[in-house]
Amino acid sequence: MKQKYFNVNASVVNIYSDPDFKSAVVTQGLLGESCVIIDSKGDWFNVNQWDGYSGWIHKHQGIITDKTYDANLTVFEMDGVVTKESGKTVIRDLTFGNILNGKPMSGGFTVTLPDGEKGWTSTLLGRMTEKPTRNSIIRLARSFMGVPYLWGGKSPHGFDCSGYIQTIYKTFNLELPRDAHQQADHFKESTITMEQAKQADLHFFKNGGKITHVALAEENGYFLHAQGWVKEESFDSSAPNFNSELKNKYAYSVTMEPILGI
């Protein structure tokens, strides 16, 4: 039987643990993402995402097809809209990390959405060709400061701790696992101490013996993470943004040198 795909057709959609809107949100899909359909139940589809994460998504939030969506451009602004080509009627909102099939035109881009509808946007679209540096990763990470915490979130509408880290690295075409414990396990051969961490390395924290939180290292003991909202805090007890709870829960850090090369 030919493989079927669920092409996400809204800027951000929740993916649930069960085929029920009342069940837990486990993660999110972003506009343009093509998910592999592995099962269905009524109006719901069980899908696998690019990072191996699976869950249930409602039929109204995407297109079921035997082809992946031909996206060639990424949204690099925090928000935007797609309007009908013939007017100002908004047909889709946009957020950072959405991917679209589009081409440049004067003052913006013409786009074809996953359902085939055509529109126009002035939102900044492009391809990430910049080779990531530790500085560029931190610059991007800081641009999300203030975004609220959202369990399962992986967009500027709301991030959870690991969704924040995954989004930052995926922007530079570097794919990380979805959850904090998976990220920790992925880099288990690259563990370092808190003091050895450079900016853009990862700090991991445990609760009850299990890894439950991740943060992005900066210099001099500072770090960025999503807890309540995306913020900068410190391991230094003399700093005004010292987080004593996380320092007590600190497990270890990992170097990102294996994927950054620096």
PLM segments and residue spans:
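Aromatic- and glycine-rich peptidoglycan recognition patches
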Residues: 64, 127, 190-191, 218-262
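...with weaker cross-activation on analogous glycine-rich loops/strands in unrelated enzymes
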Residues: 175-232, 236-238
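A structural connector/turn signal
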Residues: 24, 89, 189-192
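Short, surface-exposed loop/turn motifs that are enriched in glycine and acidic residues
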Residues: 127, 150-158, 190
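Active-site nucleophilic cysteine motif
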Residues: 141, 153-172, 177
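Boundary regions of SH3-family modules and the immediately adjacent low-complexity/disordered segments
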Residues: 1-4, 20, 27, 31-42, ...
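Short, basic/aromatic beta-hairpin or loop at an interaction surface
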Residues: 5-16, 69-82, 170-184
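Structural motif
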Residues: 12, 44, 108, 221-222
